[in-house]
Design a protein with these regions (language model features):
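NAD(P)H dinucleotide-binding glycine-rich loop of Rossmann-like/cofactor-binding domains
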Residues: 3-7, 12-13, 33-96, 137
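A glycine-/small-residue-rich N-terminal strand-loop-strand element
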Residues: 15-39
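Mid-domain Rossmann-like dinucleotide-binding core that forms the NAD(H)/NADP(H) cofactor-binding site
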Residues: 29, 69-143, 147
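Short glycine-centered segments of the SAM/dcSAM-binding site in methyltransferase folds
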Residues: 33, 91, 115, 181-182, ...
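Short, glycine/polar-rich helix-capping loops at beta-to-alpha or helix-loop-helix junctions
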Residues: 42-45, 121-128, 210
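Glycine-rich helix-loop-beta junction characteristic of Rossmann-like nucleotide cofactor-binding loops
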Residues: 82-86, 153-154, 175
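Short amphipathic alpha-helix with an adjacent loop that forms part of the alpha/beta core around
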Residues: 144-156
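Glycine-rich phosphate-binding loop and adjacent beta-alpha segment
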Residues: 168-252
Length: 255
């Protein structure tokens, strides 16, 4: 139900100059160059969004680079800095680490001094992950990442798992968590591109597995789900904070 009615102009991420504000609350943005998130409609010459979904950026920033701060980096920031508290030395697993959100998570986690395991699916991505700061890249197509983690972690368990794949990987991640560990899930790529309609969706749900709150309670663990559309709709000030802090971190050279 999150899909827009057809015909529709797609696009979540925009960069440009604010030419008009619909209320006095957004007047301070008029004439400013901003990065913003939209509820679709971004692939157009002009776009409309909530003034709280904008952050002012330097006039000399590359538009393509700045656009990445919207959906991809906002998702990563919300996952890594709002939903959990990363600490120096934390053992962190990032699925699909070479993707947009994965890259952002690497940079944010490395900034906090975390030790990072990152999964990837093609050999050409390994060098990229090492350059980004991943300590242990794991090719999930060649090895069982769950077993590989246990082989390489020297008895340590995960403090945080960031998962955009879902399904069976979610169950595996939970089994890797340390006491006090958290699993943060923000996607279900295991379902993407598969035919079968409702049956594929039910299979995905089955693969996620079942767990009881008492299991989490006894181990002081947590499972956190993220849908940035819900944050944009119901917590726009949180979204604004994420965007503004991402701009600061970029200016500081962290990202």
């Amino acid at each position: 139900k999150d899909a827009p009615p057809m015909p529709s102009i797609l696009g979540y991420d925009v960069v440009g100059e604010v030419i008009e504000a619909g209320s006095e609350a957004g007047n301070h943005l008029v004439g400013k160059r901003v990065v913003a998130m939209t509820r679709f409609g971004g692939y157009a010459e002009q776009a409309k969004t909530d003034y709280r979904a904008c952050a002012i950026i330097p006039s000399d920033w590359d538009a393509t680079m700045a656009c990445a701060l919207a959906t991809q980096y906002c998702t990563a920031y919300y996952a890594a800095y709002e939903c959990v508290q990363l600490h120096n030395g934390f053992q962190v697993l990032i699925h699909a680490a070479a993707g947009g959100v994965g890259t952002a998570l690497i940079q944010l986690a490395k900034h906090k001094g975390c030790y990072i395991y990152g999964t990837y699916g093609s050999d050409d991505k390994k060098e990229y992950l090492l350059n980004q700061g991943v300590d242990i890249p794991i090719n999930y197509r060649k090895v069982d990442y769950q077993k590989e983690f246990f082989n390489l972690s020297e008895g340590k368990r995960l403090d945080v798992a960031f998962n955009s794949v879902g399904g069976t990987t979610f169950k595996n991640d939970v089994s890797l968590l340390d006491k006090g560990g958290k699993s943060v899930i923000y996607g279900a790529a295991e379902r993407s591109g598969k035919k079968g309609g409702i049956f594929s969706t039910l299979n995905l749900a089955w693969n996620f597995g079942l767990m009881t709150p008492i299991q989490l309670l006894m181990n002081s663990q947590g499972v956190i789900g993220i849908n940035m559309l819900r944050i944009a709709d119901y917590k726009p000030l949180v979204l604004q904070h994420c965007l503004q802090d991402l701009v600061k971190l970029t200016e500081q050279g962290v990202l």
